[in-house]
């Protein structure tokens, strides 16, 4: 609210413009329903985790889904404590963890989100 209405909007209008595209929902189910209503079809649900699961997919796989435009995607970033197993099992896919040069791969959500969004929607520098 601060960035959309008060001093924050005046201080940083670019952030206010970006947040105009954000919609808040009270649950994952309501987010899926909102996307379904807007897009006319249910989204492919994808989440992130520092662990792998049987339905873990690569960045390349999700990037192809995103660029195909066949179905809407709902990408959910969890918390530092992760999500309940039942919730994890409800997603179509779990995106592979962000791996680095060592075994430790737990990042704050803001850092992980920035890296993941760049890998999914950023320039494909590795194809050049």
Residue ranges and their predicted role:
Residues 1, 52-54, 102:
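Short, catalytically relevant binding-site loops at active-site mouths
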Residues 1-50, 114-126:
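RNA substrate-binding interface of SAM-dependent RNA methyltransferases
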Residues 5-12, 71, 89, 93, ...:
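Residue-level signal for well-ordered alpha-helical segments
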Residues 36-42, 66-71, 89:
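Flexible, charged surface loops at secondary-structure boundaries
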Residues 43-46, 72-75, 92-94:
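Structural motif
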Residues 49-86:
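Long, charge-patterned amphipathic alpha-helical coiled-coil/hairpin "stalk" segments used as oligomerization
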Residues 81-128:
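Structured adenosyl-cofactor binding patch, chiefly the S-adenosyl-L-methionine
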